Amino acid sequence: DYEDVNVKGLNAELRGYQKLGYRWLKNLDYYHLGGILADDMGLGKTVQILAVILSYVNENGKNAKPSIVICPSSLSLNWLNEVKKFAPSLKCIAIGGNAIQREKQIEKIPSCNIIITSYELLKRDIDLYKEKNYEFKYAIADEAQYIKNNNTQNARAIKVINAETRYALTGTPIENSLSELWSIFDYIMPGYLFGHKKFKEEYETPIVKDEDENAMDKLKQLIEPFVLRRVKKEVLTELPDKTVTVLYNEMGEEQKALYKSYLAIAKKEVKQEISENGFEKSQIKILSLLMRLRQICCHPSLFLSNYKGESSKLNQCIEVLKDAISSGHKICLLYTSDAADEL
């Protein structure tokens, strides 16, 4: 009965399909199994996971182990804000800053309910996690396509994390090959789909090269209990007319340093301009400087033609677009600068 789902402290009214997802995740956890929540973009994978974590903390109180969320760096702030919005009682920290700051944050993990870190920072800090040997209740790989290649540092690092139950969140469990699915399963339940060599021999090669339907049916039977995917058209009656999701973004170190440098220059120029001409006659100059700072926030190359670094906002935009396109959605992308079209 999915109607009796009531997680104390959850600031959200779960829809029917979300209650089903919550129960599915809880049942997997009960049997010490992992799973892939592969719902379509916009169906609330985050709130379903937070409901599970909050339920566990409610049941175990001070004895509750921390859980860890690993996501693209552009989504760390969004996860932090989602926790504050839907489960404010959970003690949560987002790992960030320089190496010394991150080490201090990692030392505080036992006193937290949720830890948020990025794939990039996990790779850098993995020796610290090994040294501390923390045991997490849940390890959640968001945008799990980041670990679809078993030979990457992302995949190797996340598999080191010691957790009772592992979940993967993705709208696209398979993008190019069955080996991607194997890699994600090797994270949530190591060994379940055998070693990579045996998996290729028994499933991937027969299915891809020989179009072996028997091998395909066997693989479907193996993975079906551990993959839950709902698309919007299946749950359309439960969705509101429009869903508004605000994504927050934090600049990377190079972009942030550039912004701070120009901010300091802008402050001096504004102070001098007002001193010489007064506020009323300085407004155009002030607006020009604000526009320059705004361009740096969007992408520094809009203002600096020789900038070769990244823009965290553009990276996040690309991730959202990829997720939407892979789910078959149509997209209307609006921007206020003609120069942004060239990015």
What residue ranges belong to the model's regions?
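ASCE P-loop NTPase motor core, strongest for the SF2 helicase catalytic module
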Residues: 1-211, 220-337
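A short, hydrophobic C-terminal helix/tail in secreted or cell-surface proteins
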Residues: 338-343
